[in-house]
Structures are given as structure tokens and as C-alpha cells.
Amino acid sequence: FTLPHELNPLIYCNQKLLYGLLHRCCAETLLELSSDKTYLGATPGIIQVLHTWNQELDYHVHMHCIISGGGLTKAHKIRRSAGKFFIPVHVLRDKFKGKYLSLLNTLYKNNKLNFSSSCERLQNSYEWKDWKDKLYKKEWCPYIKETFNGFGNAIEYLGRYTHKIAISNSCILSVTENEVTFSARGKKPGEPKRQITL
């Protein structure tokens, strides 16, 4: 689940609160939809890892989730999913977006949010409504893919995000007093590596 970049300034000013909201909304979305018999009718296992940067080291708030391909029914029986992806991406997207923006709006109404200069205008209720309405109209893009030859490989893939630094020494190409140049993967699989200077 990736949050639109329009949220970045507000999230940055409210990291603990809004990272927590992201965790909550991801879990609730997956659990609520999984419990629906249309999709699974059971409670799956879920692992979530918050990630706050991308290959270019930009602030890019998103949640990696691993969800089991089945779960426990209310009768404590194991139920397997019928297909590869048992919840359609558009259903996940719409449920998550509605949940996140609704709870974010509740935080706003209850004066729980901090505002810095980068998002200070949102303190004005008219600005807030306009900003929020634009986020509702924007298409949010959750990304779903099949595991890599089994659950163990998915855990290994996720582990690379949780047990490494943002950039390894082997990626650093040059360092000057003012800049660092490093190589990053292509944005899509199969694209060549890129050089980025910060």
C-alpha cells in the first residue's frame, strides 16, 4: 500500500501518528475483506513492514504486506484461497483509501494533527476540505504480486528491507564535499541501473 506523495508533508510532521494509522488501515482493510465470504471467509496471517524511502532515497511512505493464502474460519477450520489473489486490487484500493482518509479526517476534526510550514495551510478548514477532496478523486495504486516460489522467499525478500541500510557502500560511485553519486535499480524489472546524484 503506497500513500500518495501529496500526504508526505503532513505525514512527516506527524510520523508516529500517521505511520500508526497506515499500519492500522492496512491491517483492517486486509482482515475485513478477508473475513468476507466473497473473498475468503477466514482470518489470514499478515506480516506488515513500513518502508519510508525509495531507490532514489526520496521520502516514499508505503507498507509491504505478506498475507497468507488462506486462514482460519470462525469455526476454527483452515480455508485456502481459491486463486492466486483472492481480493481484487480495485476492492483493496477503494476500501483502503476510504478508510485512511476517513480516519485522517477524524484526526483533523479532533485537533490531533501537527502542521509545519510545508502543510500549514491545511489548518484552514476550507483548504483541508479541498485537499482531502482531491485525494479522494486521485487514484491510489496498491501493488499486488504473487510470492516468489513460496512463502520463505517472500520473507527473505521482505527481510532485505528490514535488515539493511538505505544505501550500501557497493552502490556508492563517488563522493565529493557536496554530492554523493550512487547506482540504483531501474524503476521497473529489466530496466538498466541508473546513476543518481544527491
Annotate each predicted stretch with a short phrase.
Residues F1-L198:
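Beta->alpha loop/short-helix hinge microenvironment recognizer with preference
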